[in-house]
From Swiss-Prot:
Gene Ontology BP, a term: response to nicotine
Inactivation phenotype: Increased anxiety-like behaviors. Increased glutamatergic activity in response to nicotine in layer V neurons of the medial prefrontal cortex.
Membrane topology summary: Lipid-anchor; GPI-anchor
Gene Ontology MF, one: acetylcholine receptor binding
Record's GO cellular component terms: membrane; plasma membrane; side of membrane; synapse
Residues covered by the UPAR/Ly6 domain: 25-107
Sites of GPI-anchor amidated glycine lipidation: G115
Protein name as catalogued: Ly6/PLAUR domain-containing protein 1
Self-association and partners: Interacts with CHRNA4 and nAChRs containing alpha-4:beta-2 (CHRNA4:CHRNB2) and alpha-7 (CHRNA7) subunits.
Keywords from the named record: Cell membrane, Disulfide bond, Glycoprotein, GPI-anchor, Lipoprotein, Membrane, Signal
Length: 141
């Protein structure tokens, strides 16, 4: 029961007037062949307090690499990325990888020669965030 109390407290903090949270992401809703949608014309402002993450989907096909990027809610993004995890084999034909991140323009081009991105959400954290989101929803039902 104390978990719901904590969840309600966090909900109150995030939904206070004046504390609107908005993130910018790269967005190309239709798959783009060999175009990673990372130029300025693909930058969009996501829906305030609803779409709090950026999502990137990469499909490797015989014709080339297909990209789709968008804003997403944390729940939708985490569910999609977890659902496709078994299909993600970078460098292999028909691989489908979906990743989520929560910093501005984080679904854009990869940084040159650096380690893994600190903003990328790790698989163990996916479950924690999903359960936290469910607790928040239960607190408001």
């Amino acid at each position: 029961m104390w978990v719901l109390g904590i969840a309600a407290t966090f909900c109150g903090l995030f939904w206070l007037p004046g504390l609107a949270l908005q993130i910018q992401c790269y967005q190309c809703e239709e798959f783009q062949l060999n175009n990673d949608c990372s130029s300025p014309e693909f930058i969009v402002n996501c829906t305030v307090n609803v779409q709090d993450m950026c999502q990137k989907e990469v499909m490797e096909q015989s014709a080339g690499i297909m990209y789709r990027k968008s804003c997403a809610s944390s729940a939708a993004c985490l569910i999609a990325s977890a659902g496709y995890q078994s299909f993600c084999s970078p460098g292999k034909l028909n691989s489908v990888c979906i990743s989520c991140c929560n910093t501005p323009l984080c679904n854009g081009p990869r940084p040159k020669k650096r380690g893994s991105s600190a903003s990328a959400i790790r698989p163990g954290l996916l479950t924690t965030l999903l359960f936290f989101h469910l607790a928040l929803c239960l607190a408001h039902c």
